[in-house]
From Swiss-Prot:
N-acetylalanine: residues bearing it: A2
GO cellular component, one term: cilium
Signal sequence region: none
Organism of provenance: Mus musculus (Mouse)
Disordered: region residues: 1-20, 68-105
UniProt motif TEK-box 2: location: 91-93
Keyword GTP-binding: no
Positions with biased composition (Basic and acidic residues): 7-20
Record protein name field: Securin
Subcellular locations according to the entry: Cytoplasm; Nucleus
Length: 199
């Protein structure tokens, strides 16, 4: 079904008043009254003392539109009224603002007592000057900590690292290289396997 478009002068522009499909089915009529177009709908039920002149139709968001148009007409943004200040009040305010700012000499004295913390200081390891690690190609080598000094000497005299000759470094207790007494404690008697039981 086609919709009807009417011109409405209340909105200050060629607005659109759409007649709904239900209104067209009920037989709504359009009446001109004092240059304004009004839509009248049939009333259902009893009507007591019906007015002779129909009321103007209510516009949606009418007050919002009016408020938005007022600043546009003046062309200036609205500013709140500021009370006029005398010379004494201005000087009092300026002295208050100057006294609230601390002097630059005594600002933050606790910064001088601050000890800087650098986490890289805990990652550095000291080596004696006679050992030169700069000759070794150490790219890709993980950080290793050796408990014994002789392990460090072995590492420095190995030469360039190669995948074929890797020295054994005991990082943890390895059961293959542990003494036989430790292996004997690990042997436990297990019960005999029973194959006859149905599972």
């Amino acid at each position: 079904m086609a919709t009807l478009i009417f011109v409405d002068k209340d909105n200050e522009e060629p607005g659109r008043r759409l007649a709904s499909k239900d209104g067209l089915k009920l037989g709504t009529g359009v009446k001109a009254l004092d240059g304004k177009l009004q839509v009248s709908t049939p009333r259902v039920g009893k009507v007591f003392n019906a007015p002779a002149v129909p009321k103007a139709s209510r516009k949606a968001l009418g007050t919002v539109n009016r408020v938005a148009e007022k600043p546009m007409k003046t062309g200036k943004p609205l500013q709140p009224k500021q009370p006029t200040l005398t010379g004494k009040k201005i000087t009092e305010k300026s002295t208050k603002t100057q006294s609230s700012v601390p002097a630059p000499d005594d600002a933050y004295p606790e910064i001088e007592k601050f000890f800087p913390f650098n986490p890289l200081d805990f990652e550095s390891f000291d080596l004696p000057e006679e050992h030169q690690i700069s000759l070794l190609p150490l790219n890709g080598v993980p950080l290793m900590t050796l408990n014994e000094e002789r392990g460090l000497e072995k590492l420095l005299h190995l030469g360039p690292p190669s995948p074929l000759k890797t020295p054994f470094l005991s990082w943890e207790s390895d059961p293959l290289y542990s003494p036989p007494s430790a292996l004997s404690t690990l042997d436990v008697e297990l019960p005999p396997v029973c194959y006859d039981a149905d599972i």
